Amino acid sequence: MLKVYIETMGCAMNSRDSEHLLSELSKLDYKETNDPKIADLILINTCSVREKPERKLFSEIGQFAKIKKPNAKIGVCGCTASHMGADILKKSPSVSFVLGARNVSKISQVIHKEKAVEVAIDYDESSYAFEFFEKKAEVRSLLNISIGCDKKCTYCIVPHTRGKEISIPMDLILKEAEKLANNGTKELMLLGQNVNNYGVRFSSEHAKVNFSDLLDKLSEIPGIERIRFTSPHPLHMNDEFLERFAKNPKVCKSIHMPLQSGSSAVLKMMRRGYNKEWFLNRVEKLKALVPEVGISTDIIVGFPNESDKDFEDTMEVLEKVCFDTLYSFIYSPRPFTEAGAWKERVPLEVSSLRLERLQNRHKEILEEKARLEVGKTHVVLVENRHEVDGQIVGFEGRSDTGKFIEVTCKEKRNPGELVEVEIISHVKGRLMATTKNNQ
């Protein structure tokens, strides 16, 4: 039995790709290990959305090269592999092969070649997306429904690393979802770069279907209790989508709405396809349909030419929406993007101050929202149990609206159970609860 160690960086799509890599390698008698020192194969599944993870890659390669077995191979996979290709081999001689994000199913071929590079982004591996393999039962499972991206946001490298957007045929998705349900999955996380644009283009001729249709079909699968998805695009959140999202009882009432900027001028420079008013209108419509909805977002500060007024527009949207989760970053220039070639730059010290102000205000908002949760009840999907000296003391999980809740109780609750809990306190935005009968 050979051993493989996988270091996964970045988004949920990368996590699913790592599962796919394990699926392919299991056919070659590889088994996953958590110790790179004993691995016969070390894979680094990379992210390139920002510069920092790329810099980390070469540090990781150096560390693994020092501790690996003499004959162990190191492979670099994912988005950084897609856009750097053979340059990775030049910079790091200890790397044996490079495998792009659109070429995951070729892993069994490249591990037998020395200095192989497979990074074509026009390779259609949608038919390989669901190589199901036996694994321990998971309460929450990742499920690809599309690959690639057709959007041309001026700051984003993803279209260059993952290629054109292709929707995976619905029959394949439903078949995989049924297998996951039979393996113990209670909650699906659907994945795609523009997940709610599903159905626009398939790899071959298929019946016309949209994202809401897919959600309805997945909801009919016995055993699946909850469905989440990431990452949707605000541009595709039309009235029909929002109304069907609200009506489907199995679709969790939490949604990611990546704002990126609250300034219409900056959004135009980013080529996002919507403006501030459109975004706020979508939020207003959504909250009218689902008042308790949980909304998360992405925000970039310090985008080229972002003025003080532009940043204040972002702060205004933050105040109006009161996002439940905020992923915020200083703009990072990326190769192969339009904005990456622009000479105008917001000084780092200005961007840093803006980010600090944004994040500090969001922390205050979370405290305010957490305080209002005390006394409310939620149904939580149990994810992990807490034990002390062999005694059950509680569990943790997420509510339908995406709130992460730590629960104290004496009775045994198994992962996958749905349990009604009452919020009793909060600490720095974290919610604490007990079961309704306080057992």
UniProtKB/Swiss-Prot annotation:
It is found in: Cytoplasm. The keyword Glycoprotein does not apply. [4Fe-4S] cluster 1 binds at C11, C47, C79. It holds the Pfam family UPF0004. It is an enzyme of class 2 (transferase). Residues 135-368 form the Radical SAM core domain. Binds 2 [4Fe-4S] clusters. One cluster is coordinated with 3 cysteines and an exchangeable S-adenosyl-L-methionine. GO terms for molecular function: 4 iron, 4 sulfur cluster binding; metal ion binding; N6-isopentenyladenosine methylthiotransferase activity. PROSITE patterns: MTTASE_N, MTTASE_RADICAL, RADICAL_SAM, TRAM. Residues 371-437 form the TRAM domain. The keyword Cell membrane does not apply. Its main location: cytoplasm. Its EC number is 2.8.4.3. Residues 2-116 form the MTTase N-terminal domain. One of its GO terms (cellular component) is cytosol. Its cofactor is [4Fe-4S] cluster. [4Fe-4S] cluster 2 binds at C149, C153, C156. It catalyses: N(6)-dimethylallyladenosine(37) in tRNA + (sulfur carrier)-SH + AH2 + 2 S-adenosyl-L-methionine = 2-methylsulfanyl-N(6)-dimethylallyladenosine(37) in tRNA + (sulfur carrier)-H + 5'-deoxyadenosine + L-methionine + A + S-adenosyl-L-homocysteine + 2 H(+). Keywords: 4Fe-4S, Cytoplasm, Iron, Iron-sulfur, Metal-binding, S-adenosyl-L-methionine, Transferase, tRNA processing. Monomer. PANTHER family: CDK5 REGULATORY SUBUNIT-ASSOCIATED PROTEIN 1, MITOCHONDRIAL TRNA METHYLTHIOTRANSFERASE CDK5RAP1. Catalyzes the methylthiolation of N6-(dimethylallyl)adenosine (i(6)A), leading to the formation of 2-methylthio-N6-(dimethylallyl)adenosine (ms(2)i(6)A) at position 37 in tRNAs that read codons beginning with uridine. Belongs to the methylthiotransferase family. MiaB subfamily. This is tRNA-2-methylthio-N(6)-dimethylallyladenosine synthase.
